[in-house]
Amino acid sequence: MSYQLVIAEKPSVARSIAGVIGADKKQDGYMEGNGYLVSWCIGHLVSLADAGTYDERFKKWRYDDLPILPQQWQYIIPNDKKKQFDTLRSLMERPDVTGLVCATDAGREGELIFRFVYQMAGCKKPFQRLWISSMEDAAIKDGFAHLKPGTDYDNLYQSALCRAQADWLVGINATRLFSILYHKTLTVGRVQTPTLKILVDRETKISSFQKEKYHIVQIVAGGMEAASERIGNADDAKALKSACETAQAVCVSVTREEKTEQPPRLYDLTTLQREANRLFGFTAKQTLDYAQQLYEKKLLTYPRTDSQYLTDDMLPTAESLVSGLWPLLPFAAGLDLSPQFGRVLNSKKVSDHHAIVPTMEFVQKGLDGLAEGEKKLLSLVCCKLLCAVAAPHVYEAVTATFTCAGNTFTAKGKTILTPGWKELDRRFKASFKTDADDTAPEPARELPEITEGQTFDKVTAAVTEHFTAPPKSYTEDTLLSAMERAGADDLPEDAERQGLGTPATRASILEKLVQMGFVERRGKQLLPTKDGHNLACVLPEVLTSPQLTAQWETELTAIAKGQADPEGFMAGIAEMTRGLIANYSQISEDAQRLFQTERVVIGKCPRCGESVYEGKKNYYCGNRSCQFVMWKNDRFFEERGKAFIPKIAAALLKDGKAKVKGLRSMKTGKTYDGTVLLADTGGKYVNYRVEQRGKN
């Protein structure tokens, strides 16, 4: 009997696939049955090797060794994943395995995960591709009924390979170069560095912003509030207020315009991450994690998509989903829905995967048993689908213009004619008590009936003081939008996206910036740290330009479509890397001090009186000729089970003694409170002793 070897990206997905295709017999590292062997990777089983693998000298960071440009790429298997790789290789080598099915995630990264394993194992057997957008049983069955030749995805693999190798070249060389120059580990990335630059540029604009005061005179006439234009001078505003209070107000024009707000598009990953951050405060990574979990539970379609449409042939699916969701969701109860599906169907705007929508399995199961974050995210996706097919929001915008005391005043109002999709949206947000959106404009009020030429004798007036506002700091919502547009603020909504990273990678980029200490979260805001600001300012434009990096991403997309040359792309990256090393061989002494860690003063040296600083492993005197040093791992404290913390060190330096709780007796092992004395004899090592003991 011959077998097809199916390789999934992770065990949970493998189990779902095995259950559908009948591979129900568990083996060590795989499942078997019905002519299939189903096994799995554990994420990236095989990765590009570190620089030190190519040459022993690359294990140390030296400028003279740069640039590092591998001629023949090498790969490694992490020790903790070697067993599963060996399982896959042995399955590939079985004589009864005649072919493979690549069932990793249907995207660029999933393709790379499979191909690296396939090549590292030296496999030459033919393989097919499972390409699905849902983990529902029906979708898996349909996917296996329509498997595609693996060679159809060779271009996608080349794109993924170029991305991985380009990230390696830029990351390894630029990180080593600038770390060597500035004497501090400075992680540089092809995508993360331009993203950091976007944050730094925004904070620079905020810090340099000069606010300006202005005034607005507001009048009330006939129950309507109308406002003047901005007035810079306070005295002028007060004079106008006084004049208005003794003058007539005359309505000189009334305009009424019917306006329509079309329903929103469905979610792609980026718009889902943005809205989940805005409404629930989820980070981009949290949203992706929740979406992936829901996908694997068969309740949500494939999340790593850049499309906001469904394919034309999905009309029956969309109709079934909407009719099933409508009675299921409390916030939709009682609303009349005449769904219009034309706006959500467009096969021309779907490449690899359609928009994110709930599955029919969710319609059958509901929200029971889900974690709170999963419930919120799934409900958000359901709401978006219903909003997208609901009626447009229609209202009448009214603008009334008045003259009073020789000045012009404007009143604005709106009358809702058809609530449409906005009523659904309002109900959803109310049901989940979503975070308030500070940037949302005040809702316009309805204006009373008014006609041109109408006069008002009784006018009240007031002056309000205002200030021009700086740009707002980025949140994950607004930064994801900026990444999608490569930092450009003036692109039209329908412009072709040439963004930083991909929907699938942006979350990890933001997390890495935080982990590296270049960005910090403060509430919902993402703010560059001092090191982050300095790094973005000292790096050359070739590494920090969002537009340039977006062009690379566009070229990677073209490679995936077979429209660009992988070798040409990599040659360009290598040339850029050579130029980088050649142009940055040295920097000024002042620049070298940019990333020096600010030393924390603990106290005064008992020997010479200079400042004592905290180091990584000790507390040391700042006077280089003085040898005073207190080691954090001093045997005295280790034997007594206490960490030699800065508070103890500071007390010893100030008073020569420190009260310490919980010292461990070296005789009995019991703890006690005591006073530690600094017994410095002026030698190489500092001594300590306990003055007194008091049992607990």
Where are these regions (language model features)?
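Basic, low-complexity terminal or inter-domain segments flanking catalytic cores
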Residues: S2-L5, M92, T151, T175, ...
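Intrinsically disordered, low-complexity regulatory segments
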Residues: M1-A164, W168, P470
